[in-house]
């Protein structure tokens, strides 16, 4: 283990990284191996984006979007996620929602509104949390911090394959352009920019299978 969690707190493994780096899949599989809970923090930002889009709010209206985040009515039930009582698992994976979420994630009001919601997922026996600032902001005392990286072309191909398998139309060139723009926004924003924590293990998954990446994380945990 990298460090000890705060006294009395459930242990946390954080897995941060850029969009489509595989962090969600890896987090779920590591959590399953350990018998822990999992937090997909990106889903909370996407749910906020979807709720704002349903209300016709432009992504530039920071106060209104922050108010939506503050009052967000969501429920997680296993693999299902509900927004205002309706299953939103398919909708939040649409690229329009993802791009909107990337823009509003830069707003301090939105990040603050979702901070305590994310920390509330920390329960025994442990939590695997994936996102962009899990190890730097949300769980700075995490027992193990992983920062996943992968070549942007590989990530775009991975996302394209995921969308097509879910029956969602996707264009590789469009995805690659959007991904580069989102990477720039995530790394350059003033609040909680995407960057590895000083004590994070940087893991390049470009040439690794999902199973190999999961094993690498488990090896770090058990070391």
Swiss-Prot record:
Q: What protein family does this chain belong to?
A: Belongs to the cytidylate kinase family. Type 1 subfamily.
Write one Pfam family the protein is assigned to.
Answer: Cytidylate_kin
Its UniProt entry gives the catalysed reaction(s) as:
CMP + ATP = CDP + ADP; dCMP + ATP = dCDP + ADP
Name assigned to this protein: Cytidylate kinase
* Organism this protein belongs to: Bordetella bronchiseptica (strain ATCC BAA-588 / NCTC 13252 / RB50)
Check the record and name the InterPro entries matching this protein.
Answer: Cytidylate_kin, Cytidylate_kinase_dom, P-loop_NTPase
Cystine bridges: which residues?
Answer: none
Keyword Glycoprotein in record = no
The answer, when asked if Nucleotide-binding is one of the entry's keywords, is yes
Q: Where in the cell is it found?
A: Cytoplasm
One biological-process term from Gene Ontology?
Answer: pyrimidine nucleotide metabolic process
Q: Which domain of life is it from?
A: Bacteria
Its Gene Ontology cellular component terms are:
cytosol
Residues reported to bind ATP: 17-25
Citing just one GO molecular function, the answer is: dCMP kinase activity
What Enzyme Commission number(s) apply to this enzyme?
A: 2.7.4.25
What UniProt keywords apply to this chain's record, in alphabetical order? ATP-binding, Cytoplasm, Kinase, Nucleotide-binding, Transferase
Task: Give the EC class as a word.
Answer: transferase
């Amino acid at each position: 283990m990298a460090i000890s969690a705060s006294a009395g707190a459930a242990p946390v493994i954080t897995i941060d990284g850029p969009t489509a780096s595989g962090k969600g899949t890896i987090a779920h599989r590591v959590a399953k191996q350990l018998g822990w809970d999992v937090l997909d923090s990106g889903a909370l930002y996407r749910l906020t984006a979807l709720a704002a889009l349903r209300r016709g709010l432009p992504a530039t209206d920071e106060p209104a979007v922050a108010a939506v985040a503050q009052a967000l009515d969501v429920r997680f039930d296993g693999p299902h996620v509900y927004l205002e009582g309706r299953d939103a698992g398919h909708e939040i994976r649409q690229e329009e929602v993802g791009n909107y979420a990337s823009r509003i994630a830069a707003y301090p009001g939105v990040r603050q509104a979702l901070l305590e919601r994310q920390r509330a997922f920390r329960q025994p026996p442990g939590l695997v949390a994936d996102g962009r600032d899990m190890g730097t902001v949300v769980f700075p005392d995490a027992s193990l911090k992983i920062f996943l990286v992968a070549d942007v072309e590989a990530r775009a191909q991975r996302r394209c394959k995921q969308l097509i398998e879910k029956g969602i139309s996707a264009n590789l060139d469009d995805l690659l352009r959007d991904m580069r723009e989102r990477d720039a926004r995530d790394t350059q924003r003033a609040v909680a920019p995407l960057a590895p924590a000083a004590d994070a293990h940087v893991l390049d998954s470009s040439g690794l299978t999902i199973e190999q990446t999961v094993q690498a994380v488990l090896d770090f945990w058990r070391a």
